[in-house]
Swiss-Prot record:
<keyword id="KW-0456">Lyase</keyword>
<feature type="active site" description="Proton acceptor">
    <location>
        <position position="52"/>
    </location>
</feature>
<comment type="similarity">
    <text>Belongs to the TrpA family.</text>
</comment>
<comment type="function">
    <text>The alpha subunit is responsible for the aldol cleavage of indoleglycerol phosphate to indole and glyceraldehyde 3-phosphate.</text>
</comment>
<dbReference type="InterPro" id="IPR011060">
    <property type="entry name" value="RibuloseP-bd_barrel"/>
</dbReference>
<protein>
    <recommendedName>
        <fullName>Tryptophan synthase alpha chain</fullName>
        <ecNumber>4.2.1.20</ecNumber>
    </recommendedName>
</protein>
<dbReference type="GO" id="GO:0004834">
    <property type="term" value="F:tryptophan synthase activity"/>
</dbReference>
<comment type="pathway">
    <text>Amino-acid biosynthesis; L-tryptophan biosynthesis; L-tryptophan from chorismate: step 5/5.</text>
</comment>
<dbReference type="Pfam" id="PF00290">
    <property type="entry name" value="Trp_syntA"/>
</dbReference>
<dbReference type="GO" id="GO:0005829">
    <property type="term" value="C:cytosol"/>
</dbReference>
<dbReference type="InterPro" id="IPR018204">
    <property type="entry name" value="Trp_synthase_alpha_AS"/>
</dbReference>
<keyword id="KW-0822">Tryptophan biosynthesis</keyword>
<dbReference type="GO" id="GO:0000162">
    <property type="term" value="P:L-tryptophan biosynthetic process"/>
</dbReference>
<dbReference type="InterPro" id="IPR013785">
    <property type="entry name" value="Aldolase_TIM"/>
</dbReference>
<feature type="active site" description="Proton acceptor">
    <location>
        <position position="63"/>
    </location>
</feature>
<keyword id="KW-0028">Amino-acid biosynthesis</keyword>
<keyword id="KW-0057">Aromatic amino acid biosynthesis</keyword>
Length: 258
């Protein structure tokens, strides 16, 4: 039986709408983790498809400056993995949450304990950008009997045979990385990006979402046209931190009809 995240995103895809997943950094709020539920409900009310929730880490190798700074602010507010898990247990939402974490915080907490402690929360997906596919066995056995999907990341340089290997048996969605580099770098896309995304569609039987560097209306239109939806991080994180209006951008993303 498919996991909840797979079912919910496939249902959105079936309507012809683009899938929209904003990223937020847990604890990057004037109230620290006490403000996480407020942010999740704000995004839920705008109709987003799912929400990616980052766990702060002191050495975020895949993060650009906006998200790296958000992580430092969160850590300064006292955010810990344990505190985040306890906070997630108190948040009621119909929107699937996807945890984005580097492996170190997960290892320190204990993978088995982490998965068990999230069992009764809205968390339905897990992204670990620094965990090689060959080491997925450190995590996958603990997810097998749960409703949490391990999300594969596929870079632009990944050949088709490797794509098949990464995607085989995956649930939730495929995270297609739009740029070679860190998050937040917009506009410098490879000429063969559309071809790469079309190839991913041929081998994936779950939605393909494009992320890293997606920040403008033009990006929304481009990537919704060649993938099943988009993930937006730095633009959302910056707007929430600075109190800038972001509602119209999110509404446009949510309403996108393919």
């Amino acid at each position: 039986m498919p996991k909840t995240l797979t079912e919910k995103l496939n249902a959105i895809k079936a309507t012809g709408k683009g899938i929209f997943v904003p990223y937020i950094m847990a604890g990057d709020h004037e109230k620290g983790l006490d403000g996480l539920g407020e942010t999740i409900h704000f995004l839920e009310d705008l109709g987003v498809s799912a929400i990616e929730v980052g766990i702060p880490f002191s050495d975020p190798v895949a993060d650009g400056p906006v998200i790296e700074e958000a992580g430092l602010r969160s850590l300064a507010h006292g955010t810990s993995t344990q505190a985040l898990v306890e906070t997630l247990k108190t948040i009621e939402t119909e929107i699937p949450l996807v945890i984005m974490t580097y492996f170190n915080p997960l290892f320190q907490y204990g993978v088995e304990n982490f998965v068990k402690d999230l069992a009764d929360t809205a968390v339905k997906g897990l992204i670990i950008p620094d965990l090689p596919h060959e080491h997925a066995n450190f995590v996958e056995p603990f997810l097998a009997d749960t409703d949490i999907a391990l999300i594969p990341l596929v870079s632009l340089t990944t050949g088709i045979e490797r794509q098949k290997e990464l995607i085989e048996g995956a649930e939730g969605f495929v995270y297609a990385v739009a740029i070679n580099g860190v998050t937040g770098k917009s506009g410098n896309y490879r000429a063969d990006l559309d071809k790469h995304l079309a190839q991913l569609h041929q081998v994936a039987d779950i939605p393909v979402l494009t992320g890293f560097g997606v920040s403008s209306q033009a990006d929304l239109e481009r990537f919704n046209a060649v993938s099943d939806g988009v993930i937006v991080g730095s633009k959302i994180v910056k707007a929430l931190h600075q109190g800038e209006p972001i509602q119209d951008f999110i509404r446009q993303a949510v309403a996108y009809q393919k």
